Amino acid sequence: ADEYLSGNVREKLRVAELAAASDPAFAVNTEYLKKAQPKDLDASEIDVRLGATWVNRDYIQQFMEETFEPPFYLRRNIEVKFSPMTAEWQITGKSTPSRNDVHAYMTYGTSRANAYRILEDTLNLRDIRIYDTVEDADGKQKRVLNKKETTLAQQKQQAIKDAFQNWVWKDPYRRAELVEKYNELFNSTRPREYDGSHIRFGGMNPEIRLREHQQNAIALSLIHISEP
């Protein structure tokens, strides 16, 4: 029972409920598993990082459009894509916004890196960096970090992260879906507990009473001894 009521208990409950639907004998399994379910975390206990691969691509697209407000005629060109094979995010058409786009080049971007390029780096968990191409003493070109422009771009990157944190939980439907998905993916496991209350110790002084944690520790030891 200890082993059955541990591990991915959400998945075990689904299996038990399917079994109970055709065989009432499994109803007792569902009752025990329901009691073993981890307490659901709520939104205030969940940290959703911009770039988390479990967040639906459509939500990132929605965030981008609502925050950067690209012109409607550009929205089909500027698209968030995610590759499950490489776990990499891409924003197509990120260079299409006009230089007059305030959100793209001032509020959330700079003249050297617009908001869409910065968002793409953020989704891929990269700090935005701005480089200049210069010639060295031998006339060869090399890239040199532009510290001033990099600092400015990273300030915009932080502004995008902050905007996402303010946005992600605002919509009740989105909040409910993300909370459910997070709990399903990352809060479904229950560690195994070892119950030693059933163990009887023959020949032991009846005046000696083992505490609960001592009995459980003995149960754990006995299980390990019995395992090959």
What is the predicted function of each stretch?
Residues 223-228:
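Conserved small/polar residues in nucleotide/adenosyl-binding loops
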Residues 199-212:
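Dynamic helix-loop-helix/coil hinge segments at AAA+ ATPase domain boundaries and subdomain interfaces
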Residues 215-222:
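Pre-Walker A adenine-sensing motif
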Residues 178-181, 192-200:
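Short coil/turn segments at secondary-structure boundaries
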Residues 1-188:
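Charged, low-complexity intrinsically disordered regions
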